[in-house]
Amino acid sequence: MAVRLIPTIWLFIVFAVIVSALPSLVSSRKLLEVKKQENLTVREEEKSHMPHVTKTSTLSALPKGKIPNSTPSKKGHAAVFAGKLRSRHLSTVDRYLRSVPSPGVGH
């Protein structure tokens, strides 16, 4: 009985090593996408529907609207501009923090 188990164990170990070395389905899709991106030229990249990662992350990180200079100028001092920026920031925070009634509670 012990003699028959040894080849079975070796086959299981070899099978486990082969399966673990193969890329999973998720990572193989990523590998295909990387190969496609490498093959694109600059013009094709501009035409592609997938936005470039650095372009989207840079644009989303930038503040919205016009940001005034923080240095003093002929029109006023930086404290006035800082107050405007603070009020703009508080208005956006207020928009996110508004309380909404729960749908389970009555009127």
Swiss-Prot record:
Region of interest (Disordered), ranges: 43-76
Assigned keywords, A-Z: Apoplast, Developmental protein, Glycoprotein, Hormone, Hydroxylation, Secreted, Signal
Domain of life, source organism: Eukaryota
Record: glycosylation sites: N39
Induction: Slightly repressed in roots by carbon dioxide CO(2). Induced in shoots by osmotic stress (e.g. mannitol).
GO MF annotations, alphabetized: hormone activity
Signal peptide: 1-21
Sites bearing Hydroxyproline, chain numbering: P101, P103
Modifications after synthesis and translation: The mature small signaling peptide is generated by proteolytic processing of the longer precursor.
GO CC, alphabetical: apoplast
GO process annotations (BP): cellular response to nitrogen starvation; nitrate import; regulation of root development; response to carbon dioxide; response to osmotic stress
Positions of the propeptide removed during maturation: 22-92
Protein family membership: Belongs to the C-terminally encoded plant signaling peptide (CEP) family.
Known role: Extracellular signaling peptide that may regulate primary root growth rate and systemic nitrogen (N)-demand signaling.
Subunit relationships: Interacts with CEP receptors (e.g. CEPR1 and CEPR2).
PANTHER family to which the protein is assigned, alphabetical: PRECURSOR OF CEP14
Name of the molecule in the record: Precursor of CEP14
Name of the gene this protein is made from: CEP14
